[in-house]
Amino acid sequence: MDEELLQRQVPQALEAEQSVLGSMLIDERCVPDVVGMLQPDDFYLRQNREIYETIYTMFNFSEKIDPVTVLNKMKERGVYDEQRSYDYIAQLLKITPTAANVKQYCTIVHLSLIHI
């Protein structure tokens, strides 16, 4: 069994994790709010955590954040998966129609951590 699965229980916030990431990709103006509320380890899925770590790092270095720059930075960091990363980013954009509710999504992710 995957050691990560043994150490963590499945939270009920996977959709909220995806919506947080999608919001940051849609509108980089919400990134400071998210960075103030969530840490990379708050993301349960490895793929979500790697995307968030990438955005988090880009934010800390005042780099522009959008789907193209994030995918490029993921390649630089060695966390880009040729089979999945591009499609997953596209999926995040598709399922997140607006960044307006990003603080609520962050709260849902945060509250799921309390129940682990």
PLM features: what roles do these ranges have?
Residues M1-S112:
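Noncatalytic partner-interaction/assembly domains of nucleic-acid and motor enzyme complexes
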Residues I114-I116:
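Conserved small/polar residues in nucleotide/adenosyl-binding loops
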